[in-house]
C-alpha cells in the first residue's frame, strides 16, 4: 500500500438536519451517498450527533454490526429488544453487537438539555452471532492515562469493551494543553477530534470535528493545544479483508 495521510475537515462532512437532530457524517450515511466515501479500513460510520431535549430515535433495527457510542455532553438513554437498558454519559462507553438482529431506541435523557455523542460502526468478523450489549465506565482511566483502549477485538489487547472484530480497536485520549500521545501503528487509522485543538506531527492543526485517515503511515505524535478529546480507530484490515 502507498502511505497516505488524508485530513478531512469538519466543514466538509455531509449533514442531516431535522427539527430535533443535527447529524454530521464522516462517511456515506442515509440519504447522503458518495461511492468514493463509504468507509476507511473497517470503519463504516462515524456520526457526530446533537439531539434536542426530549427527543430521540424510536425503536429501529440493526443486524450484523458492532456499534460503539461515546457521549461528549449530556446523557443518552438506551433500550433494546434483548432487555438491555441504561443511560450513557461522558466517560461511559457503550458497545452493542446487533448480531442476528436487535431493535433499540436512543433518546435524550433530559427534557431541558441537548445531548452530543459520536456513534461508530464496524462490521463483525462473522455474521449471525448472538446480539449482545456492554457498557463500561472509563472516565478515571482517561484522566490518568494518555491513550486508553475503549473497545477492541485484537488478540492480546486489554480494553473496556469487547469487539467482535479481531482486526479493530478504538482508542481514546482526553488531553490537557501541551500533552502529547503517540498514535498506534497499523495499516489503517482513523483519527477524529471530538473537541479541542491539536497539532498532528507533520500534518498541522486539527480542530473540532476534523478527521484524519491514515493508510500505512509512519508513527507520529499528536499534541493538544487546548483541552481536547480524540477517538482513534486502529485497524489491521479493510472492508472485504476481515473474516466472514
Swiss-Prot record:
Catalytic activity: quercetin + O2 = 2-(3,4-dihydroxybenzoyloxy)-4,6-dihydroxybenzoate + CO
Short name of one Pfam family: Pirin
GO cellular-component term (any): plasma membrane
Binding sites annotated in the UniProt record for a divalent metal cation: 60, 62, 104, 106
Entry keywords, A to Z: Dioxygenase, Metal-binding, Oxidoreductase
EC number(s) on file: 1.13.11.24
GO molecular function: metal ion binding; quercetin 2,3-dioxygenase activity
UniProt cross-references to InterPro entries, sorted A to Z: Pirin, Pirin_N_dom, Quercetinase_C, RmlC-like_jellyroll, RmlC_Cupin_sf
Cofactor: a divalent metal cation
Family membership noted in the UniProt record: Belongs to the pirin family.
Known role: Putative quercetin 2,3-dioxygenase.
Protein name, per record: Putative quercetin 2,3-dioxygenase Rv0181c
Source organism of this protein record: Mycobacterium tuberculosis (strain ATCC 25618 / H37Rv)
Source lineage: Bacteria, Bacillati, Actinomycetota, Actinomycetes, Mycobacteriales
